[in-house]
């Protein structure tokens, strides 16, 4: 079964149930969806073993924000087991003070529920929180939640309406800590 990039781009920042719904609608068959997801999971799990790399500037940015007294939490559409495994592999999991994952919410990104829950768990109002995102769905989620959104696009460029809702769009995580501090 073929799957094109445009379809894959719809998955970015989405929870597994949302991805499965998108696939069901696209293929019109839950059996095909299950087969596509099973193959995707095999490929992804193999890639994680051999190709998982930390995004340049991520560790430095987190360390700088922690040193400056910021609370650093994680809000990811991934399942907790996946996020924990991947972040432990790159030495970052223990740096996050709170973790909110896809299975913690009913509605995944672009719905604001994930960021609203992450803010609540951290003990801050959304307008006190900075969200760092690399996808359209994540940015929309953070913007709609009322957070300050800092975008560092990764795979797909952000549409202008999303860019307009962000505090700033950066080319690299190396510039992120300074941008966050400038808003404080």
Question: What does each of the following model-derived ranges do?
Answer:
Residues 2-3, 7, 22-60, 68-70:
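Metal-dependent phosphoesterase signature
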Residues 12-16, 36-44, 79:
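Hydrophobic/aromatic residues within well-ordered alpha-helical segments
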Residues 16, 54, 111:
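Conserved donor sugar-nucleotide recognition element shared by glycan-biosynthetic enzymes
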Residues 63-66, 79-184:
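Asp-based, Mg2+/Mn2+-dependent phosphohydrolase catalytic module
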Residues 73-74, 151:
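Hydrophobic beta-strand core positions in alpha/beta domains
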């Amino acid at each position: 079964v073929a799957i094109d990039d445009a379809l894959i781009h719809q998955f970015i920042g989405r929870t597994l149930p949302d991805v499965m719904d998108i696939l069901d609608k696209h293929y019109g068959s839950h059996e095909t969806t299950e087969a596509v997801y099973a193959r995707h999971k095999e490929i992804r799990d193999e890639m994680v073993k051999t190709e998982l790399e930390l995004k340049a500037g991520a560790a430095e940015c987190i360390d700088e924000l922690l040193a400056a007294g910021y609370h650093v939490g994680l809000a990811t559409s991934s399942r907790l087991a996946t996020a924990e495994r991947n972040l432990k592999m790159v030495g970052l999991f223990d740096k996050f003070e709170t973790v909110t994952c896809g299975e913690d919410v009913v509605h995944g990104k672009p719905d604001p529920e994930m960021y609203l829950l992450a803010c609540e768990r951290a003990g801050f109002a959304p307008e006190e929180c900075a969200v760092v995102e690399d996808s359209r769905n994540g940015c929309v989620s953070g913007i709609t939640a009322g957070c300050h959104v800092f975008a560092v696009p990764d795979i797909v460029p952000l549409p202008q309406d999303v860019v307009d809702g962000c505090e700033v769009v950066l080319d690299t995580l190396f510039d992120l800590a300074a941008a966050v501090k400038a808003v404080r």
